Amino acid sequence: MTRHRSLLVCALSLAVLSSLIVMTPAPAAAQPAGYPVGGIDISSNDHLRYPIEWAAEVARGTRFAYVKATEGTSYANPYFHGDYGAARSAGLYVGAYVFARPDRGNPVGQADFFLSHAEWTRDAKTLVPFVDLEWPYSGIHTDSCYDLSPAQLTGFIHAFLDELEARLGRPPMIYTNSNWWNPCTGNDRSFGRYPVDLASYTTTPPRLPAGWTTFTIWQYAPGDVSIDGDYDRDVVNGGEADLAALAWTRVHPVPSPPRRPGWTIRNP
């Protein structure tokens, strides 16, 4: 009986220890040297198991956050307004982003849907929005380039960005990576005037896509939604002044670009 009790206590102790090991957050990836201004980007996926730890982010020195607002013309992140407001209340620079769906066409409609759900304040803490252009996730049943030719894809992107710029008064930012951008756009070089946020999970600065001579933000580490506080990690290429330059009051509005001819796409 005593032996059985001892074995039971041992087994329970191991179970508790195992659960603690699983639940203990892994240390976040080290911020690259020479890039002092760090931030995060989040979506509804980051709420699957844990709340967003805004106080912890401020304590670790996080200075900005991007929050996913929409995708396509039908999905709006249910956590967007709460996360956006919490980040602002924590004193962070905050921006919104949209996950583009080239496979669904209607780039102007997608841009307008995004603007109808995002929060815009022309102050010194609201960051220019970005358009997420990357590989389709597992639930999107297309090839890596959304079943589009480079000409079709770049036409979609131009129409999307033109609509945002016309309505916002300044160029939006593009989020992408060289490994997707170059083959899917055919090494198109016509987007270099836009600020770019590059995903590159390495210890050295990201490889630039065709058309760019520098980057604005570097996403240097991916998040893991199974770990508390482990979010996508970013740094600004520069210092605090470069982050502030992405806020509304730091750049004078630019003239709206001319609308491009209507763009359509076949149904997938």
Indicate residue ranges for each PLM-predicted region.
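Hydrophobic anchor at the start of a short beta-strand
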Residues: V94, R170-P172, V196
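Structural recognition of alpha->loop->beta junctions
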Residues: L115-F130, W135-S138, G186-T214
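Conserved beta-strand positions
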Residues: I42, V67, V131-L133, I174-N177, ...
